[in-house]
Amino acid sequence: MSMTRLLCCLVLLLALPLQPACAGLLQDRLEARQLEQAGIRVLRDIAYGNDERQRFDVYLPTSPSRGPAPVIFMVHGGGWANGDKDNGSVALNKALRWVPQGVVLVSTNYRMLPDTPPLAQADDVARALAHAQQLASGWQADPARFVLMGHSAGAHLIALLDAAPEIAAQQGARPWIGSVVLDSAAFNVETVMRGPHLKLYDRAFGEEPTTWRAASPTLRLEQAGAPLLAVCSTRRDDACPQARSFAAKARKLGKRVEVMDVDMSHRQINHKLGRDNGYTTDVEHFLRSVGLLRH
């Protein structure tokens, strides 16, 4: 940042309301300071494709622990049309919580609506996963110990890869050890589209039932695969019923699925994860059970 811009921001701190651009710069500096103090370095905008959205960030311990580190691979939400890997609620709290424990965190972007529909977004996420796994050894991380995590639309994309791992395999990704799905209400897109629903689902999934079925994790699920934790908000009408239906089908296939219903808003489920609270501790029980965190 130039001295002029920094002085501008410091002066504007004395004025109300704070200018949005300046506030963003100050927030970036604050977050960078928090990461530095926690012993975390960040590799920004690693490309896994030619589009400017095909980038991910990597949060690494400044002093790596002994042995290859496990990896959390995080996918942001935003209704398949918005959001970013840099948003504070996506990566910051999670990095501050888990990187000091010896975990590497990857936070990825992907192409979005209106140009890229969810099924192609899942391909992007799978391609990012494959590239992260290929680079993992250079971060002193273990490509065989990835846990996938996503919130909202990102949770749907992670659930889709979990239910249809051939999507990931086609992009060169290796199997992972677990998935954490943070408040998706789109396990069964066909059910959503045949009932009352928000317009964002129309923009994402259109009018073709074949597309609805292809984008439905519950309908695509045919094999056991890695364990999955589905966190759902009891303040929403559809999130927990959708998660339970997915879990019921999974159990018949011998797949381990845990449903964690929480009295939090959709936003809080993402924003509070990584903070020092019982909810984070409960998620960590799952992460330990799949071998990501030490007991």
Protein language model regions, located:
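N-terminal cap/lid segment of alpha/beta-hydrolase-fold proteins
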Residues: G24-S65
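Mobile cap/lid helix-loop segments that gate and shape the active-site cleft of serine hydrolases
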Residues: E31-L35, D51, A185, V189-R220
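Short beta-strand element of the alpha/beta-hydrolase
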Residues: P68-G78
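Short amphipathic alpha-helix adjacent to the substrate-entry channel of hydrolases
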Residues: D86-V106
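Alpha/beta-hydrolase active-site loop
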Residues: T116-A136
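Primarily recognizes the serine-hydrolase "nucleophile elbow" in alpha/beta-hydrolase
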Residues: A130-R194
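Short beta-strand/loop motif that positions the catalytic acidic residue
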Residues: A230-C232
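Conserved alpha/beta-hydrolase "acid-adjacent" motif
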Residues: D237-R244
